[in-house]
Amino acid sequence: MKRIIVNGWLMISMGVFYSCASHKYTKETLNLHAVQVDLSMEQGVKRQIEYYEEGVVYAFSFRSGGVLLILQGPLMKTPIDDFKPSTSLKDKHLIEKGMDKKGLKWRRDTYSSFRVCYFNVIPTEERKFYRILNGIKFKATMCEW
């Protein structure tokens, strides 16, 4: 009897673990003016595209309140442009990250031809955003306007 209860508890706890851990992702291809960006995005995220004179902005809004921006264009400002980073890394691109006054996480990746950033991310959700940003692949394209 004790063994059945322990096995039942183990099965229930593993089911809860796997239901929380499994998110469905789809491949997104974004066409910026001169760059094609491929990334793996969680399903159920709201997507908004805005074109302006010098570039394009893709905004992804998550249920948890986090926002992911992918943009091209030198004059476009983001809500985190004035934040002071707690750490900066420079490898193939510049990575800056930190925490705002409310304790929410943010990160800004600056590539040569576009920028990617997230903000308003609760610390427990940050791993999901890292997965998206660290999985970005891009290639230059020739786009006629």
Pin down the residues of each PLM region.
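Positively charged n-region of N-terminal signal peptides that target proteins for export
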Residues: 1-6
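C-terminal motif of bacterial Sec signal peptides marking the signal peptidase cleavage site
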Residues: 18-19
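Secretory pathway targeting signatures of secreted, lumenal, and periplasmic proteins
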Residues: 30-84
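Surface-exposed amphipathic alpha-helical segments
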Residues: 33-39, 43-47, 115-145
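Short, surface-exposed beta-strand/loop micro-motifs that present aromatic residues
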Residues: 58-60, 100-111
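Short, surface-exposed beta-strand/loop "edge" segments at domain boundaries and coil↔beta transitions
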Residues: 64-71, 76-78, 101, 113-131
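Short Gly/Thr-rich strand-loop-strand
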Residues: 80-106
